[in-house]
């Protein structure tokens, strides 16, 4: 498991109803596993479209689910269907949200600019990164691969599209953990502003396994999105919502 059951404030999960979520981490850190777990909180009446290179996502309990898979070119170099092609097609299929297994190139433009900023704000994807700030830098680079815009415009789009970055890692004992959950506050003073909500604190070893806790560091500040997700004012300020 990823060792997070019962440790994450329900407010973070509830933001998944309407917030853009990006999962980051290295190879084998559990990004796809956690994305599957996060998808359990998607309202069951939504229309979901998943897009992958190879089918790995296991979205359960959603009746209106469309799975799209990329395809390599044939021996003649024809017939390829890319992740970017599929995102563009998915946008015409009237989804409530789009879930992309991994973005790694110019398709980031369509995921950020077209999907997350145009009525599909609960969309999610994964990507390789060393920490939340590194994830932002990689997203900037990938968007620059696909569109000619000033960096400031790209940063503003990313800041508007994303609400939460969840960073996962594989520790030296081979366990996989959520290491940090970060809120994207917006664009200000020439940069994307972040706030750490939770951070994994290592507490030692027991029977060869790393023990630790995902410690809460700050409250979510995006009050309007929590209200839109169904939280009451009491819930935002510490109640159960």
Regions found by a protein language model. Name each.
Residues 174-241:
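NTP-binding/hydrolysis catalytic cores, primarily Walker-type P-loop NTPases
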Residues 33:
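Conserved structured catalytic cores and adjacent interaction surfaces
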Residues 8-11, 235:
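Intrinsically disordered, low-complexity segments enriched in serine/threonine/proline/glycine
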Residues 24-27:
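P-loop (Walker A) phosphate-binding loop of NTP-binding proteins
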Residues 30:
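Conserved glycine(s) of the Walker
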Residues 36-88, 135-139:
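P-loop NTPase switch/communication element
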Residues 52, 59-62, 90-189:
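Conserved P-loop NTPase nucleotide-binding/switch module
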């Amino acid at each position: 498991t990823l060792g997070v059951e019962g440790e994450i404030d329900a407010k973070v999960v509830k933001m998944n109803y309407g917030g853009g979520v990006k999962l980051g981490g290295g190879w084998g850190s559990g990004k796809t596993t956690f994305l599957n777990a996060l998808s359990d909180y998607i309202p069951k009446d939504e229309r979901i479209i998943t897009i992958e290179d190879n089918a790995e996502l296991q979205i359960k309990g959603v009746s209106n689910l469309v799975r799209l898979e990329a395809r390599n070119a044939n021996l003649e170099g024809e017939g390829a269907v890319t992740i970017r092609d599929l995102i563009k097609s998915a946008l015409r299929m009237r989804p409530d949200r789009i879930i992309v297994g991994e973005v790694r190139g110019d398709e980031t433009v369509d995921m950020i600019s077209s999907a997350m900023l145009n009525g599909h704000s609960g969309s999610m994807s994964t990507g390789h990164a060393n920490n939340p700030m590194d994830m932002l830098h990689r997203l900037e680079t990938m968007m620059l691969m696909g569109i000619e815009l000033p960096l400031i415009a790209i940063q503003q789009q990313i800041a508007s599209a994303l609400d939460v970055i969840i960073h996962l890692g594989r520790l030296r004992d081979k366990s996989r953990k959520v290491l940090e959950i970060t809120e994207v506050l917006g664009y200000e003073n020439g940069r994307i502003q972040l706030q750490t909500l939770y951070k994994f604190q290592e507490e030692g070893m027991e029977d060869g396994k790393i023990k630790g806790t995902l410690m809460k560091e700050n409250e979510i500040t995006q009050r309007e999105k929590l209200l839109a997700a169904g939280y009451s004012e009491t819930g935002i300020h510490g109640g159960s919502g």
